[in-house]
Amino acid sequence: MAKSSPTYTVLFLLGLLALSTATTTFQNEGQRSLIGQFNSRGTFKKIKNHPSESVQRSNEDFAMHKTKLKHKFVARSGGETDVKKMEGSMPDQGKTAGRDQQVTVQNIKEASKENVGGNTNDIYKSGGMHH
């Protein structure tokens, strides 16, 4: 095969193309099935009880890591230092680092007695409780 005919070249290139297409398709399928699927509207829905528990577990680890960091940060900033007090409060809502501000169920009840626009979301938008 001293002089390679153009037919061989074309076949070779076609083979490469087919191979690359196949691998990318396979990768995409793999990634999609790992987390969830796009439904007909193009929005993403997660698969419940999917065998990829390792993904779930790593997400939980990350969430725990984030709360640990948050505890550290809030404690350093001279705000709430007691982690026990922080737990059981509503996550992140109306809580500002460096301020002793905790949103608890009781606070929300009190605030709703004051009737802040009649909408509990207003409590969070206002950036804290009204004392």
Swiss-Prot record:
Keyword match Signal: yes
UniProt signal peptide: 1-22
Tissue: Tapetum of anthers.
Disordered: annotated segments: 75-101
Keyword Signal recorded: yes
Source species: Antirrhinum majus
Annotated protein name in UniProt: Protein TAP2
Alphabetized UniProt keyword annotations: Signal
Domain of life: Eukaryota
